[in-house]
Regions:
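Bacterial N-terminal signal peptides
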Residues: 10-20
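Conserved catalytic neighborhood of penicillin-recognizing serine enzymes
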Residues: 100-135, 143
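Bacterial N-terminal signal peptides that target proteins for export
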Residues: 1-11
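Short, conserved catalytic-motif segment at the N-terminal edge
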Residues: 35-64, 87
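Structured C-terminal helix/loop/strand segments within mature extracytoplasmic catalytic/sensor domains
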Residues: 24-36, 50, 55, 138-139, ...
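Short, well-structured active-site flanking segments
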Residues: 80-99, 147, 198-201
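Mid-domain, small-residue-enriched loop/turn segments at the edges of structured enzyme/sensor domains
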Residues: 41, 116, 134-193
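Active-site SXXK
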Residues: 52, 64-93, 257
Length: 286
């Protein structure tokens, strides 16, 4: 479903950390089953986009590695600077071979001509390009400045400490480069619906997420025709996998869903399958 049929609009922000209402416990049963199948921790939360009310949650306040899901927050910070007149999406950034890190399918093709800030955000979100993320991090002042931006939004949980690809290390009990499902869901909701960004910037962020090209095996694989999804996946060491999404029927999003898992010995295909099955249960019991 094209984003042309959906436009973001301001929605008053209410505290999302209310008591959960387990309207469809079948999905939580599937989340717990995924833990058993993967031999790993799984964190899950589902928020109503309009009210911020928690609809379902499992391990919502346990820390998980962010992996590449942080790239949405990063581009939110970039757009905030654009709104403040401190950055321009059309500004071209030049870089060298020495700047390239592993998994940079877009930036490696533009060594001669460079890329605009807009193009870098698109590459970071739609293709999860790691060099694009590092170049964007440089424009805002590095990982600590992204953490400071999140603090300014009221998120004192989510933190970025390192650059790509080291931030994907996912060492157990290491709080670096981590978030909690509840914190991530609330922050994503603020970026997409709150007053932090202008309407144009909110629309741009969700456009990039809707155009995600690397999350096909996850929630997208369970979506019926006509549903809307804008998402960003992540993968890391020690069996870590994650996805953050805004989705809903009738071509527009109505819920925020965040799923993280870490500590599994399972293959990537199996991790993808378990997340897709959680998505299938979510949709079945919508």
């Amino acid at each position: 479903m094209s984003i042309q049929h959906f436009r973001v609009a301001p929605i008053p922000f209410f505290a999302a950390f209310c008591l959960p209402v387990f309207a469809h416990p079948e999905t939580l049963v599937k989340v717990k089953d995924a833990e058993d199948q993967l031999g790993a921790r799984v964190g899950y939360i589902e928020l109503d986009l309009n009210s911020g009310k928690i609809l379902e949650s499992f391990r919502p306040e346990e820390r998980f590695p962010m992996m590449s899901t942080f790239k949405v927050l990063l581009c939110g910070a970039v757009l905030s600077r654009v709104d403040a007149g401190q950055e321009q999406l059309g500004r071209r950034i030049h870089y060298s071979q020495n700047d390239l890190v592993e998994y940079s399918p877009v930036t490696e093709e533009h060594l001669t001509d460079g890329m605009t800030v807009r193009e870098l955000c698109s590459a970071a979100i739609t293709m999860s390009d790691n060099t694009a993320a590092n170049l964007l991090l440089t424009t805002i002042g590095g990982p600590k400045e992204l953490t400071a931006f999140l603090h300014s939004m009221g998120d004192h949980v989510t933190r970025l400490d390192r650059w790509e690809p080291e931030l994907n290390e996912a060492i157990p009990n290491d709080e670096r480069d981590t978030t909690m499902p509840a914190a991530m869901a609330t922050t994503l909701r603020k970026l997409l619906t709150g007053e932090l960004l202008t309407l144009a910037s909110r629309q741009q962020l969700i456009d990039w997420m809707e155009a995600d090209k690397v999350a096909g095996p996850l929630l997208r694989s369970a979506l019926p025709a006509g549903w809307f999804i804008a998402d960003k996946s992540g993968a890391g060491e020690r069996g870590s996998r994650g996805i953050i999404a805004a989705l809903g029927p009738d071509g527009k999003p109505s819920r925020i869903v965040v799923i993280y898992t870490t500590g599994s010995q399972a293959t990537m295909d199996e991790r993808n399958r378990q997340i897709a099955e959680i998505g299938a249960s979510l949709i079945k019991h919508w």
